[in-house]
Structures are given as C-alpha cells and as structure tokens.
Amino acid sequence: MAKVQYFGTGRRKKSIARVRLVPGEGKITINKRSIEEYFGLETLRVIVNQPLVLTSTNGKFDVLVNVHGGGFTGQAGAIRHGISRALLKADENLRLELKKAGFLTRDPRMKERKKYGLKKARRAPQFSKR
C-alpha cells in the first residue's frame, strides 16, 4: 500500500525548504536532526510550529524537512511557508485561515545589493567637513 504524504516547498530570502508531511504523532525533523537540536532559539521553533498550531494539526503529522541556504531566520520562514503549502495539499479547507495569517504568501523582502561608492547597501563613508 502506498504511504500517504504531502509535499510543499517554501522559500524565504536565500533559503529553500522541501517539506514532507506524513501522518504521525507530531515529530519535526530538519536535515535529519530534531527541531530542538537544529534551532537553538525558541522563537525560531515557534515560527516553524505556527501553521500547525493555527490549524490544530500539530499532533497529526510528522514533518520531515530538507532545508538549505540562508541563515536561521530565513530557514525558519522557509520551513513555515513549506509546511503551510503542504497542509493545503492535505486539506484545502485550511486555505482561508492560512491565507488570513499570511503563511501562504512568499515574503518578497530580499537583501539589498551593495552600491559602489558606499560601504554597504545604504551606509555612506563618513563625511568630514574639514
């Protein structure tokens, strides 16, 4: 018998997360490590769990994630986006509450490029009057 699983891809900044939802008891595995082991900060764990808590599905699915690129915050956002998309494939009725919370929207904010003549994207070199 084929195993029921739902896939979702999430992106945020430079991070890309491939998420797989499998019916289970609510374990979250990121790059073959537990969520507690992967994300040291509690706030990042909360971000990842948001779609599951919102839709009351946090004990129904095991979440298997493969994520690469970017930093911790970007990865947490990408995982949240991927979980939301996978939940949508599992149950289309969740669209309204996920959309209302903004979890289905790809955050378009990216790092601004550095310009020549400046130290960073907007930081100008120190000005000296004399």
Swiss-Prot record:
Q: Which InterPro entries match?
A: Ribosomal_Su5_D2-typ_SF, Ribosomal_uS9, Ribosomal_uS9_bac/plastid, Ribosomal_uS9_CS, Ribsml_uS5_D2-typ_fold_subgr
Q: HAMAP family, alphabetically? A: Ribosomal_uS9_B
Indicate the secretion signal residues. Answer: none
What is a single molecular function from GO for this protein?
structural constituent of ribosome
Q: Which gene encodes it?
A: rpsI
Can you say what this protein is called? Small ribosomal subunit protein uS9
Please name the taxonomic classification of the source. Bacteria, Bacillati, Bacillota, Clostridia, Eubacteriales
Q: Which UniProt keywords apply?
A: Ribonucleoprotein, Ribosomal protein
> Cross-referenced SUPFAM superfamilies, in alphabetical order?
Ribosomal protein S5 domain 2-like (SSF54211)
Q: Which family does it belong to?
A: Belongs to the universal ribosomal protein uS9 family.
A GO cellular component term found in this entry reads: cytosolic small ribosomal subunit
Q: Which PROSITE patterns match?
A: RIBOSOMAL_S9
GO terms classed as biological process: translation
Q: Specify where the region named Disordered lies, as residue ranges.
A: 109-130
